[in-house]
C-alpha cells in the first residue's frame, strides 16, 4: 500500500516539490536500518554495579558500552593522557611531553599510541566511534588565542633558543611555521595510525569542526548563530584533517543562558550546518558521518534539558541528516545513588521517550521515503521540519516495572504523514544506491565499498 503511494506521488513530487538540491551519498549506517543512532558516552558504570540503578539505556534505543562504561566497543574516547605522548599544559598548569608539538618526538608518541590503542581497543574488528579529545591547543596558529596563547609564546621562545641569530620577525615567522607543521603531523599521523590499526572504526577529533559562534552572551538580541566568515575560512584550511577523518565530532553543548530559547536552536543549527558542509567536502565518494556531542544536562550543571531543548539538539541533529548524536556526561552522573536516580528518572521520562520518538521517526522515513537505502534530510536546511512521530498516528507505550521495561511504538503511517515527509525531506542515499528515493543500484559506487 505504502509503495503504491510513493509510485503515485513520485511524478507529482518531482515536478512540484523537488528542489533539485544535490545531496552527496552517505556511508551506510553503523547498524543496518538504523539511520540515526544515539550514543551514551558517560562513566555511569557505578550506577549499575555499585548502586544497583539500571539506567535502562538500551530500552530507550540508546547505544552504550558494556556496563555503561565510558569507553568500549560502541564508543571509545581518548583523553590527553590516554593516547601517546600528547604535548600540552593541563588546566592546573602542569607540563606534559615538551609542552609544544615541535618539542616532542613524534616517533616516540606514535609508538606509545600504538600500545594505548591496543590496550583500550583490543579487537581489530572494532567498528564503534573512536574519538580523540585533544583540546589544549589547536593546529592553526591563529586559533590559539586566550589561554592557548601560551603555545604561541612557547613556540617563539623555542625558535629563539635554536636560532638566536635571527631577527624577531624572522623568529615569529619560523615559530608559526614549525608549530603548524608539528601540530599537523601529530594530529594527522595519530589519526592515520588509529585507522590503520582499527580500520572499521569511525575516527575523528572531538570539537572538530568548530564554528566559534559563542557570542550569544554578549549581544543575545542580535545573535544569529552564524559561524564567522573567518572561521569558515579557517575550517577550509583544515582540509588535510577532514580528508583523513572518517567521522566528525562537533559539539552542541547548551549553557543555561540558552535554555528554551530561539538562540539555542540558532546555536545548534549553524554548528551542524558547518559540520555538514565540511562532511561533504572532505571526500569525493561520500559525505563523512557526523556525530555531534551533546549533554543531557545543561553545561556545567546537573539541570536536565527541557523538552524544547531536546528538540533543539537531538531533533535538529536528526533533521539535518547527521548519522547520530553522542551524549557525553561527567563522573557526577554516577557519584551517588541520588545522582544515578536523577539520571535514570530523566532517561525514563522526557529524554528516553524523545529519543525513541526521533530514532523511530528517522527509521520510518528511511523505510517509506528512501526504501531503507538512505536517510531523510531536510530539503531546506533552515526549515522547521523535524523527524517526529505523528501524534495522531503513533503512540509510545512503556511497559514493565522499575527493574524491567519495554518500549513499544504503535501506529501506522497515514497518507497525509507521507505527504508531509515528501514535501519536507529528501533522501541522502547510502553508497551503492541512487535515485530520488534511493531505489536504484549504483554499480560504480558498490565497487568502491
Swiss-Prot record:
One of its GO terms (biological process) is hyaluronan catabolic process. SUPFAM superfamilies: (Trans)glycosidases. Pfam families: Glyco_hydro_56. Gene3D superfamilies: Aldolase class I. InterPro entries: Aldolase_TIM, Glycoside_hydrolase_SF, Hyaluronidase. Glycans are attached at residues 67, 103, 111, 153, 357, 401. GO terms for cellular component: cytoplasmic vesicle; extracellular region. PROSITE patterns: EGF_1, EGF_2. Its EC number is 3.2.1.35. It is an enzyme of class 3 (hydrolase). Residues 1-23 form the signal peptide. Expressed by the venom gland. Residues 427-438 form the EGF-like domain. Disulfide bonds join 47-340, 211-227, 365-376, 370-427, 429-438. It is found in: Secreted. The active site is at residue 135. It catalyses: Random hydrolysis of (1->4)-linkages between N-acetyl-beta-D-glucosamine and D-glucuronate residues in hyaluronate. Its main location: secreted. PANTHER family: HYALURONIDASE (PTHR11769:SF9). Snake venom endo-hyaluronidase that degrades hyaluronan to smaller oligosaccharide fragments. In venom, it is not toxic by itself, but increases the diffusion of other venom proteins by degrading the extracellular matrix. In addition, it displays antiedematogenic activity. Belongs to the glycosyl hydrolase 56 family. This is Hyaluronidase. It comes from Crotalus adamanteus (Eastern diamondback rattlesnake).
Amino acid at each position: 500500500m505504502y509503495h503504491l503511494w510513493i509510485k503515485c506521488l513520485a511524478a507529482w513530487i518531482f515536478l512540484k516539490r523537488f528542489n533539485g538540491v544535490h545531496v552527496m551519498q552517505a556511508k551506510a549506517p553503523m547498524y543496518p536500518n538504523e539511520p540515526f543512532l544515539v550514543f551514551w558516552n558517560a562513566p555511569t558504570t557505578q550506577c549499575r554495579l555499585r548502586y544497583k540503578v539500571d539506567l535502562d539505556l538500551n530500552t530507550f534505543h540508546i547505544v552504550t558500552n558494556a556496563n555503561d562504561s565510558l569507553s568500549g566497543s560502541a564508543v571509545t574516547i581518548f583523553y590527553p593522557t590516554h593516547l601517546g605522548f600528547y604535548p600540552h599544559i593541563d588546566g592546573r598548569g602542569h607540563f606534559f611531553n615538551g609542552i609544544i608539538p615541535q618539542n616532542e618526538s613524534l616517533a616516540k608518541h606514535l609508538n606509545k599510541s600504538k600500545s594505548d590503542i591496543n590496550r583500550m581497543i583490543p579487537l581489530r574488528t572494532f567498528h564503534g566511534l573512536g574519538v580523540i579529545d585533544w583540546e589544549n591547543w589547536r593546529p592553526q596558529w591563529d586559533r590559539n588565542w586566550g589561554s592557548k596563547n601560551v603555545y604561541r609564546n612557547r613556540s617563539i621562545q623555542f625558535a629563539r633558543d635554536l636560532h638566536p641569530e635571527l631577527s624577531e620577525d624572522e623568529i615569529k615567522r619560523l615559530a608559526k611555521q614549525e608549530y603548524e607543521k608539528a601540530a599537523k603531523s601529530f594530529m594527522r599521523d595519530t589519526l592515520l595510525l588509529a585507522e590503520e590499526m582499527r580500520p572499521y572504526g569511525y575516527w575523528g577529533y572531538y570539537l572538530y569542526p568548530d564554528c566559534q559562534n559563542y557570542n550569544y552572551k554578549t549581544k543575545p538580541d542580535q545573535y544569529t548563530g552564524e559561524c564567522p566568515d573567518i572561521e569558515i575560512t579557517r575550517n577550509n584550511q583544515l582540509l588535510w584533517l577532514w580528508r583523513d577523518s572518517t567521522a566528525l565530532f562537533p559539539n552542541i553543548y547548551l549553557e543555561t543562558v540558552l535554555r528554551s530559547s530561539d538562540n539555542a536552536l540558532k546555536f545548534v543549527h549553524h554548528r551542524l550546518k558547518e559540520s555538514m558542509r565540511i562532511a561533504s567536502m572532505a571526500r569525493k565518494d561520500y559525505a563523512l558521518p557526523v556525530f555531534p556531542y551533546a549533554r543531557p544536562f545543561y553545561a556545567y550543571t546537573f539541570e536536565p534539558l527541557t523538552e524544547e531543548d531536546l528538540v533543539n539538539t537531538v531533533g535538529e541533529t536528526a533533521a539535518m541528516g547527521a548519522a547520530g548524536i553522542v551524549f557525553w556526561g561527567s563522573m557526577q552522573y554516577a557519584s551517588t545513588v541520588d545522582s544515578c536516580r536523577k539520571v535514570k528518572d530523566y532517561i525514563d521520562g522526557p529524554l528516553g521517550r524523545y529519543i525513541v520518538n526521533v530514532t523511530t521517526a528517522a527509521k520510518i522515513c528511511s523505510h517509506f521515503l528512501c526504501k531503507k537505502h538512505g536517510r531523510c534530510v531536510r530539503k531546506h536546511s533552515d526549515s522547521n521540519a523535524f523527524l517526529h512521530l505523528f501524534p495522531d498516528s503513533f503512540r509510545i507505550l512503556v511497559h514493565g516495572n522499575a527493574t524491567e521495561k519495554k518500549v513499544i511504538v504503535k501506529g501506522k503511517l497515514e497518507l497525509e504523514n507521507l505527504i508531509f515527509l515528501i514535501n519536507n525531506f529528501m533522501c541522502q542515499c547510502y553508497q551503492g544506491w541512487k535515485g530520488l528515493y534511493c531505489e536504484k543500484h549504483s554499480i560504480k559506487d558498490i565497487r568502491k565499498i
